[in-house]
UniProtKB/Swiss-Prot annotation:
It is found in: Cytoplasm. PROSITE patterns: KH_TYPE_1. Keywords: Cytoplasm, RNA-binding. A probable RNA-binding protein. This is RNA-binding protein KhpA. Belongs to the KhpA RNA-binding protein family. It comes from the Bacteria. Residues 30-76 form the KH domain. GO terms for cellular component: cytoplasm. It comes from Leifsonia xyli subsp. xyli (strain CTCB07). Its main location: cytoplasm. GO terms for molecular function: RNA binding. CDD domains: KH-II_YlqC-like. The lineage of its organism: Bacteria, Bacillati, Actinomycetota, Actinomycetes, Micrococcales. The keyword Iron does not apply.
């Protein structure tokens, strides 16, 4: 449920929504959501001083309802 919600939000931010990929992985410390976007959109997703990325992490934490979830913006 978290990956589709995060995908929807990120697609609304970027200029190339077809390139947005969110992959959910399990780790011993909880779930990890890896966000991959077009390299041209990386700055939009991270935001000035990381503000947008922090807002995305806050949103996912609220939706996680107490579960441990980490959001990583991956730079390929």
């Amino acid at each position: 449920m978290l990956a589709p919600a995060l995908t929807h939000v990120v697609k609304g931010i970027v200029d190339h929504p077809d390139d947005v990929r969110v992959v959910a992985k399990s780790s011993p410390r909880g779930e990890v959501l890896e966000v991959r976007v077009n390299p041209e959109d990386l700055g939009r997703v991270i935001g000035r001083s990381g503000r947008t990325a922090k807002a995305l992490r806050t949103l996912v934490t609220a939706l996680a309802d107490g579960r441990r979830v980490r959001v990583d913006v991956v730079d390929d």
